[in-house]
Amino acid sequence: MSVNNNREMLILNPKEYEEIHLKLVRKSFNIDLSILKRFKPHTLIEQNTASLMDRVDSKFLLPIHIFEPLMNTLLKDYSILDVNGRNIFNYQTTYFDTADRQFYLDHHNGKLNRYKVRFRRYVDSDMGYIEIKFKNNKKRTIKERIPMNCVTPDQEEINDFVHKKLGYSTPLETALYVNYQRITLLNKHNPERITIDLNLSFESAKESIKSVQEKIFIVEIKQEKKPYPSSCREYIKMNGYKSTDFSKYCIGCALTKNVNRNFDLLKKNRFKLILNKLDSLNTQH
């Protein structure tokens, strides 16, 4: 299916995004990362065999002070992604939405069968992908993506892909920029992948309002099905933390006072508990 070029759904401008993301970079770690070298390493090829593009996710929002004890707990059961001696990687994500912020509102209103569209750039390898995440009515996350040239993206390919997956032609615009640094672990015994995201920073596309979250980190447990034994989940729950429906896109929009086409602030009632939790975690020492 080909998209009418007179009405492109999504115009990608990686160079512009990169300039904005570079201003968001934060590297002021207050934690010791030397523990990462104590994990058994795995390669990107090995990790791709457990890509879990169709999966069940559990997300946990945690204070930075439990990062080191958590990692110590995971040493026995998990390996760590290692690329040329590097174990922590820089991500730049640009999110797109309709002018009315329909993707945001679908999530806010608890709608299933909902989408998120983003351009993700892996800074350390200079690889880019257009990605579409779909949360179905069984609460499974299905992610599809295509590689994208970060210098001269193929606009026709982008629009064909997005149109085919979304099933409509409403134009999308840049909504939010997100930076973070990621560690990826694989369970040695079960089909489970864990991502640990640190040093999150956000900027709204229209208002250029920034929010930096350096005192928290996000753990996401990704499995084919539930429940597999997970020492990661057990440790987190043992310490009194519960899973939360945390979306970087939605929370980033709420933190940066994102607006719709009429410059009306987006409603965020559904996210107040998470926003309050963020405030609480940011005051812990």
Model-predicted regions and their roles:
Residues 1-285:
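Phosphate-end processing signature that detects enzymes handling 5′-triphosphorylated RNA
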